[in-house]
């Protein structure tokens, strides 16, 4: 059994150079641009998925917020495809890296906050102080609300990292256990393999759900600031 449980989460290196960039670019190949007048099945599915995502995420937004629709849809498709590709055996999942998720979360969060302060400065500042707050609690509540505001991108990144990492780690443990049990107890190995198969199906759903949750929270931050 592999003693290093976190070996699958190490960034792959080729000739001493990390190949993370190539892995991140890879999902874009799954969504080709249409180059024909008549769409094929792949393009039709892509357009249907784009319309469905847009309807779910952008229906509550104002016209200013809907200008973010293309970026939010691209974000969802990127995270979802990255998570799904990470389900392939012996593959690397970039979304298990906290640095990458923080790198996605902070610019998006900062963009929504900057949009709010530019378009609705008074309302954005009012979020830092709930209405009807007693005078002696004002300094404390302003500090608390400010801290909670800056924690949002960190929580966004940690949530995605933790859920994807936990799922892959559990699959790795059960898979290693199944291989060990095959030589000692075939019946128990079949049971653990069945559990692994069910967990794999669940992780495919988690991969899509976490992509949707990440994008939805960014959409909610945008809605609060537009």
Curated annotation (Swiss-Prot):
CDD domains hit by this protein: ATP-synt_Fo_a_6
Record GO cellular component, one term: proton-transporting ATP synthase complex
PROSITE patterns: ATPASE_A
GO biological process, one term: proton motive force-driven ATP synthesis
UniProt GO molecular function: proton channel activity; proton-transporting ATP synthase activity, rotational mechanism
Principal location listed in the UniProt entry: mitochondrion
SUPFAM superfamilies: F1F0 ATP synthase subunit A
Pfam families linked: ATP-synt_A (PF00119)
Alphabetical list of Gene3D superfamilies matching this protein: ATP synthase, F0 complex, subunit A
Keyword annotations: ATP synthesis, CF(0), Hydrogen ion transport, Ion transport, Membrane, Mitochondrion, Mitochondrion inner membrane, Transmembrane, Transmembrane helix, Transport
Catalytic reactions on record: H(+)(in) = H(+)(out)
Membrane topology note: Multi-pass membrane protein
Cellular compartment(s): Mitochondrion inner membrane
Bilayer-spanning residue ranges: 5-25, 68-88, 97-117, 136-156, 179-199, 201-221
Quaternary structure and partners: Component of the ATP synthase complex composed at least of ATP5F1A/subunit alpha, ATP5F1B/subunit beta, ATP5MC1/subunit c (homooctomer), MT-ATP6/subunit a, MT-ATP8/subunit 8, ATP5ME/subunit e, ATP5MF/subunit f, ATP5MG/subunit g, ATP5MK/subunit k, ATP5MJ/subunit j, ATP5F1C/subunit gamma, ATP5F1D/subunit delta, ATP5F1E/subunit epsilon, ATP5PF/subunit F6, ATP5PB/subunit b, ATP5PD/subunit d, ATP5PO/subunit OSCP.
Family statement: Belongs to the ATPase A chain family.
Function: Subunit a, of the mitochondrial membrane ATP synthase complex (F(1)F(0) ATP synthase or Complex V) that produces ATP from ADP in the presence of a proton gradient across the membrane which is generated by electron transport complexes of the respiratory chain. ATP synthase complex consist of a soluble F(1) head domain - the catalytic core - and a membrane F(1) domain - the membrane proton channel. These two domains are linked by a central stalk rotating inside the F(1) region and a stationary peripheral stalk.
Name of the protein this chain belongs to: ATP synthase F(0) complex subunit a
Taxon lineage: Eukaryota, Metazoa, Chordata, Craniata, Vertebrata
